Design a protein with these regions (language model features):
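A generic structural signal for short, solvent-exposed coil/turn residues
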Residues: 24-26, 70-72, 191-192, 210-211
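Extended, solvent-exposed, turn-rich assembly/linker loops in the middle of proteins
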Residues: 27-109
Length: 222
């Protein structure tokens, strides 16, 4: 599970920031930067903050369209945390345009399958699928934290794809066994003694790659 969490964290940070940092006890800290354009990470400024707008008269459509225009391709999904959802759903004009009765979308269902407990599909805003995510990870101090920082809105496309890359395992036993390309290298060994002990370990060197970081636009909503 620890390896899966590293993969998830790399993938999430690649989407949120267009880069992430790799750290470890046995190698120097490395920043993996995919070269996202500055305009694809947006922070709402004073006067533009949704929290400052009138709930009955403000229409967020114009802002959302401007944000989507920053993406390198078509945007068809908006993923947000609960804070952003509550703000958006608080606007009367947003609620009037939100379509919660449209038929299912097989591609969207595939994108969020097996995530029913932490992902909620709210409906369509025009052609934009509205999804609230509550996915989390376990931090180094043992506490559970959300992958999406509070007030985060991610705009992207359900067809966007990353690449799972894996480095070589520096393990003499793996080399002696003629290890082939794989995402995991499990091993076990015995220690002599009374009692004898058996140990197991799984090694991996993941590197999640986002070929086009500008496919996504990330907005800090305030």
């Amino acid at each position: 599970h620890a390896i899966v969490q590293v993969e998830e964290m790399q993938a999430v940070n690649a989407v949120l920031y267009g880069k992430y940092t790799m750290e470890g006890d046995q190698f120097d800290t490395v920043e993996v930067d995919f070269g996202r354009s500055e305009g694809n990470n947006i922070e709402q400024a004073d006067g533009k903050k949704w929290s400052e707008q009138d709930r009955d008269t403000f229409d967020p459509t114009h802002d959302i369209d401007l944000y989507c225009d920053q993406a390198s391709g078509l945007v068809n999904i908006a993923i947000m945390d609960g804070t952003v959802w509550r703000l958006l759903n608080g606007f009367k004009l947003f609620r009037e345009k939100l379509d919660t009765r449209r038929g299912s979308n097989s591609q969207l269902e595939t994108a969020v399958k097996d995530l029913g407990a932490v992902v909620s599909f709210k409906g369509y805003y025009g052609d934009l699928a509205i999804v609230v995510a509550k996915t989390s990870y376990v931090a180094e101090d043992g506490t559970e934290k959300r992958y999406l920082p509070e007030g985060t809105l991610v705009l992207g496309n359900t067809a966007a794809e990353g690449i799972r890359c894996y480095g070589a395992i520096q393990d003499a036993q793996a080399l002696s066994e003629g290890v082939v390309a794989s995402s995991r290298y499990p091993k076990h060994w015995l220690t002599v003694g009374d009692p004898a002990r058996e140990f197991t370990m799984t090694q991996s060197a993941p590197l999640m790659v986002l070929p086009d970081p500008d496919e996504f636009v990330v907005v800090q909503v305030k």
